Amino acid sequence: NKAVDFSFRNVSYHVEIVGVDVFPQGFAAVADRLSDFRGVNMICDIGNGTMNIMFINDKKPVSGNMFTEKYGTHQCLLAVRENVMRIHHTTVDEAIINRVFRFGTADIKEDYLKTITDTATDYVAGIFKRLREHEYNPELMRLYVLGGGSCLIRNFGVYDASRVTINDDICATAKGYEYLAELNARKGNSR
């Protein structure tokens, strides 16, 4: 369709589509810094349900080297709930789990916190295992982690901080798309 009609919050809209640009997941968040991506770089965008992996080699995305794993923050949350139920025979509110994910701690008893952090640490080890399955080698490349799940890496990962960049700005992708649209408009490619 070249035009779409819809209403949102009791306001009717008519939108004409004049062009579409498609970018790999995670690319927009780093598009304004491509000049920093010398050598081999792995991008890891950890979302709620998936983890998207791509390579940028010498400032250029490698189109044949992009992967999606069903290994996002929600799966970690489910693992935490399961372990808390198994060990403590109780449920834990999602807000508590998310607070531990984001900050590494919460105002709860130490044994519950240990169960949550141990589970998150194991889960993050699984993230790095999957990255290695896609040829991640910290001695040969840099890792750039973004998305809502980047806090898991920051708080529970074991990594060389000089070789890993964590961008926990959850608006990074939206800012990147805005940057790419402005770049297109400046080049005269607005349709």
Predicted regions and their residues:
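Active-site-proximal alpha-helical scaffolds that flank and shape metal-associated catalytic sites
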Residues: 44-48
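Active-site-adjacent segment of 2-oxoglutarate/Fe(II) JmjC oxygenases
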Residues: 83-95
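A short beta-strand motif that forms part of the nucleic acid-binding face
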Residues: 57-59
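Nucleotide/phosphate-binding catalytic cleft detector across ATP-hydrolyzing
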Residues: 1-43, 61-75, 95-191
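Short beta-strand scaffold segments in enzyme catalytic cores
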Residues: 51-55
